Swiss-Prot record:
GO biological process, one term: epithelial cell apoptotic process
Classification via InterPro entries: TMEM258/Ost5
Lineage summary: Eukaryota, Metazoa, Chordata, Craniata, Vertebrata
Subunit structure: Component of the oligosaccharyltransferase (OST) complex. OST exists in two different complex forms which contain common core subunits RPN1, RPN2, OST48, OST4, DAD1 and TMEM258, either STT3A or STT3B as catalytic subunits, and form-specific accessory subunits. STT3A complex assembly occurs through the formation of 3 subcomplexes. Subcomplex 1 contains RPN1 and TMEM258, subcomplex 2 contains the STT3A-specific subunits STT3A, DC2/OSTC, and KCP2 as well as the core subunit OST4, and subcomplex 3 contains RPN2, DAD1, and OST48.
Name of this protein: Dolichyl-diphosphooligosaccharide--protein glycosyltransferase subunit TMEM258
Name of a matching Pfam family: Ost5
Keyword Iron-sulfur part of the UniProt annotation: no
Residue ranges crossing the lipid bilayer per the database entry: 17-37, 59-79
Cellular-component GO terms for this entry: cytoplasm; endoplasmic reticulum membrane; membrane; oligosaccharyltransferase complex A; oligosaccharyltransferase complex B
Statement: the UniProt record of this protein carries the keyword Phosphoprotein: no
GO molecular function ontology, one term from the record: oligosaccharyltransferase complex binding
Organism annotation: Bos taurus (Bovine)
Amino acid sequence: MELEAMSRYTSPVNPAVFPHLTVVLLAIGMFFTAWFFVYEVTSTKYTRDIYKELLISLVASLFMGFGVLFLLLWVGIYI
C-alpha cells in the first residue's frame, strides 16, 4: 500500500480543547484529592470506611491521571 493511498490519522479529541480538558480534569482531580485528605484528617479510626477511601482515591487518581495526560499533550509531548 502506497503512502498517498493511506488516509491521514485524526485524533478523536480536537487539539484545540486540550487546555480546557487539562484545567477541568485537574480541577476535578484536585477537588477529590482535597476531599480525601480532609476525610482522612477528620475521621477517627472507628468512623473510617475503607470502601469510601478507595472510591474517593480511585476517582481522584483517574481525573488527575487524565488531566496530566492532556497536560502533556497540550505542551507538545505526544505519548
